[in-house]
Amino acid sequence: MAISDSVSPEPQQLLCLTITAFRKPGMSEAAYREYMTKTHAPLVSGLMEEYGIVRYNMTHNNSKSRPLLFQLYDPEFSKLSDYDCIVQFVFRRMEDFLRMKSDPRFLEKVAPDHQKFADTSRSTMTIGYFEEFLENGKVVPK
């Protein structure tokens, strides 16, 4: 079987866009989390639902949570990450996410909102295929 350079997902396979996000310089951790969860997330969540985005979540990595990692310390995985938050979007098709990003409401309200809290010059992104093995404490049958 030949290996192809173009990789396309299986019809039911979900995509996951992951952003390792940094807060705007001068913004406190508390203000960043408050803004992201109470202002930005509500601003974009309805639009995501409208365009069929399956999942949108944040994991905040701050000065209270970072030291917890030392309780899990393992020499194999010992490097601490310094980002402030991981943001993940799970969706069925690229077209769904792209249509949402081209919606006038996204362009007029959501996109400019990032300047209020995010240091996009430091943030990184990746996209891959989402697969879940444990959900609500139960093994997901494969």
UniProtKB/Swiss-Prot annotation:
Start and end residues of each EthD domain: 25-121
Task: Answer yes or no on keyword Repeat.
Answer: no
Q: Does the keyword Metal-binding apply?
A: no
Known EC number? 1.-.-.-
**Which pathway is recorded for this entry?**
Pigment biosynthesis
Question: What is the deletion mutant like?
Answer: Leads to the production of dark red conidia. Does not affect virulence.
Q: Which UniProt keywords apply?
A: Monooxygenase, Oxidoreductase
- Induction trigger: Highly expressed during conidiation. A conserved conidiation regulatory pathway containing BrlA, AbaA and WetA regulates expression. During conidiation BlrA up-regulates AbaA, which in turn controls WetA. Moreover, the Hog1 MAPK regulates fungal conidiation by controlling the conidiation regulatory pathway, and that all three pigmentation genes Pks1, EthD and Mlac1 exercise feedback regulation of conidiation.
Function as written in the Swiss-Prot or TrEMBL entry: Dehydratase; part of the Pks1 gene cluster that mediates the biosynthesis of an anthraquinone derivative pigment that contributes to conidial pigmentation that provides protection from UV radiation, heat and cold stress. The polyketide synthase Pks1 produces 1-acetyl-2,4,6,8-tetrahydroxy-9,10-anthraquinone though condensation of acetyl-CoA with malonyl-CoA. The dehydratase EthD and the laccase Mlac1 further convert the anthraquinone derivative into the final conidial pigment.
What family, per the record? Belongs to the tpcK family.
Name the record gives this protein: Conidial pigment biosynthesis dehydratase EthD
Q: Which organism is it from?
A: Metarhizium robertsii (strain ARSEF 23 / ATCC MYA-3075)
Q: What is the lineage of its organism?
A: Eukaryota, Fungi, Dikarya, Ascomycota, Pezizomycotina
Q: Which gene encodes it?
A: EthD
